[in-house]
């Protein structure tokens, strides 16, 4: 994998879990050239942000992107690197016109890093591959398609308290072998609610043929999410608790045929396992996984197996890890919460995984 201009290896970058706001803005705010009222640009009175807007440019770079002024807060006082004004202007033009996906240069005053992947780079097992798969999953979920990830072509990473990836990948429709260039903007967010891993998407789309004509990038609307899906992740629900629960109609016990039909349940399970063992191994080291039981809970008005189609849902998954990094096969429990705000391309996935003997 080749990094353009003074690479920063992803493995060497850690996400701070002490910062609760990244200060990113959306495309429409960028074009408006000023903060819209009520957009939450200042957080003096807000200590409990639930969802972050990652998008592709920070507030500090707003004036630079629009007026090409020197970036505010991005230059190290001890950094003597001089940026060619023409190169800087081209850099921000590429960001603006491609929504942050097609950037082939880097300037030392920006925190954006550009990576081009070789055909043999296997990124499915690291966080970039996971984010690409999540983005494609949500595109399929919303479009009713069945595209499969072939490989990641390139990605841009941006660290500003959170790690955001603008990923360009190749996908295929196995029904007719049609190939597509897929784009997704995914953020690995700070963990706030007793979860092990939190992933948010803002863009999940086929690359537009003409730059600037794709799905519009919009901020997350936290107010649109039901309060029941906010706060800390719920505790594991036992069969005894379920039997005495007054809201049994909100639950559905997933059948084996459902698991085969909805392969994203396997994806959720793999990511949950990854969140437990991250740092010890790559995702491919913990598969295959054997799903033993899945219970889905939602307040949305779906009957029986249709509950799997709910945008807002909580999944209780018990599974066995065959290739655990320490010792023999182990049984696990995972809690996965999926929330949406009604904006196309937006989904938030929170993962918590436990060993059953802990």
UniProtKB/Swiss-Prot annotation:
InterPro entries with a match to the protein in the record: MS5 (IPR006462)
Residue numbers spanned by region Disordered: 31-82
Superkingdom of origin organism: Eukaryota
Biased composition (Basic and acidic residues): 58-67
Family in the record: Belongs to the UPF0725 (EMB2204) family.
Protein name in UniProt: UPF0725 protein At4g29550
Organism field: Arabidopsis thaliana (Mouse-ear cress)
């Amino acid at each position: 994998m080749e990094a353009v201009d003074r690479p920063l290896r992803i493995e060497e970058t850690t996400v701070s879990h002490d910062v609760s706001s990244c200060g990113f803005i959306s495309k429409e705010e960028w074009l408006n050239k000023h903060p819209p009222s009520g957009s939450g640009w200042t957080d003096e009175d807000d200590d409990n942000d639930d969802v972050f807007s990652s998008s592709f440019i920070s507030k500090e770079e707003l004036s630079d992107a629009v007026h090409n002024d020197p970036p505010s807060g991005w230059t190290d006082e001890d950094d003597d690197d001089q940026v060619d004004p023409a190169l800087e202007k081209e850099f921000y033009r590429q960001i603006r016109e491609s929504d942050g996906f097609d950037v082939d240069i880097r300037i030392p005053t920006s925190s954006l890093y550009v990576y081009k992947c070789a055909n043999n780079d296997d990124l499915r097992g690291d966080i970039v591959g996971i984010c690409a798969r999540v983005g494609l999953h949500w595109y399929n979920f919303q479009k009713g398609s069945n595209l499969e990830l072939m490989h990641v072509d390139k990605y841009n990473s941006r660290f500003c308290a959170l790690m955001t990836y603008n990923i360009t990948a190749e996908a295929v429709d196995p029904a007719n072998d049609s190939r597509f260039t897929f784009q997704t903007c995914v953020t690995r967010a700070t963990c706030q609610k007793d979860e092990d891993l939190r992933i948010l998407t803002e863009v999940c789309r086929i690359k537009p043929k003409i730059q600037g004509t794709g799905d519009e990038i919009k901020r997350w609307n936290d107010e649109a999410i039901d309060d029941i899906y906010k706060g800390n992740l719920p505790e594991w629900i036992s069969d005894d608790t379920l039997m005495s629960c007054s809201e049994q109609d909100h639950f559905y016990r997933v059948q084996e045929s459902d698991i085969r039909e909805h392969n994203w349940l396997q994806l959720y399970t793999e990511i949950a396992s990854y969140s437990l063992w991250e740092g010890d191994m790559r995702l491919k080291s913990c598969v295959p996984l054997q799903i033993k039981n899945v219970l889905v809970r939602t307040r949305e008005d779906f009957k029986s197996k249709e509950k799997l189609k709910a945008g807002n849902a909580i999944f209780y998954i018990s599974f066995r890890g065959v290739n655990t990094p320490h010792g023999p096969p182990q049984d696990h429990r995972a809690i996965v919460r999926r929330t949406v705000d009604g904006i196309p391309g937006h989904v938030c996935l929170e993962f918590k995984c436990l060993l059953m003997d802990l």
